[in-house]
Amino acid sequence: MSRIGRRPIALPAKVEIQIDGQHIAVKGPKGQLSRSLPPLITVQQNAQMLTVSRLNDSRPARQLHGLCRTLVANMVDGVSKGFERRLELVGVGYRAAIQGSKLVLNVGYSHPVEIPFPPGIQIAVEGNNIIVVSGTDKELVGNTAARIRAVRPPEPYKGKGIRYLGEQVRRKAGKSGKAKK
């Protein structure tokens, strides 16, 4: 049994919390985030610590306890440090560029693929082949990075495509030619 929900969340000095019933708002140097929590979960603030507790020991309350604690901890980390995902383009002629508020990818299709940024996300391109997705909301950063990767996921034969930096692509052997008679 996991006991993640019982661990208190330490608040950095520059982070402010507002708890209004089931709604929690976190404000810090990088921005602000807010979220509504389920009615089975409560959050209390004691000095520079947050504790997440459940109202009863029912199965749904136990399931949500660790989840909500982690979501609140990610909100605190996001407004204080921020989150970042890096993607790498692998392939001849594969390029990324930023035009206005869109990421433009040339990844082997007959046309460039344009991906608009969601609000709260910053995208930067290092060189021609490294894309850096950053922001305060961990879920939004991950979803945006996954949407970019889904444009051209890495293929198993040559390894070309868009992958997370450091991702291992499982390679397959190509088809072996038939023996001639």
Swiss-Prot record:
Ordered alphabetically, the record's keywords are: Ribonucleoprotein, Ribosomal protein, RNA-binding, rRNA-binding
Which cellular components does GO assign to this protein? cytosolic large ribosomal subunit
Which PROSITE patterns would you find in this protein's record?
RIBOSOMAL_L6_1
Entry keyword Ribosomal protein: yes
* Residues spanning the signal sequence: none
Listed as disulfide-bonded, the cysteine pairs are none
Record has Transmembrane helix as a keyword: no
What Gene Ontology terms describe what this protein does at the molecular function level? rRNA binding; structural constituent of ribosome
Coiled coil segments of this chain: none
Its BP terms in the Gene Ontology are:
cytoplasmic translation
Function of this protein?
A: This protein binds to the 23S rRNA, and is important in its secondary structure. It is located near the subunit interface in the base of the L7/L12 stalk, and near the tRNA binding site of the peptidyltransferase center.
PANTHER family (UniProt xref): 60S/50S RIBOSOMAL PROTEIN L6/L9, LARGE RIBOSOMAL SUBUNIT PROTEIN UL6M
Q: Per the similarity annotation, which family is this?
A: Belongs to the universal ribosomal protein uL6 family.
Q: How does it assemble?
A: Part of the 50S ribosomal subunit.
Q: What is the name of this protein?
A: Large ribosomal subunit protein uL6
Query: Which source organism?
Result: Synechococcus sp. (strain JA-2-3B'a(2-13))
Its ancestry begins with: Bacteria, Bacillati, Cyanobacteriota, Cyanophyceae, Synechococcales
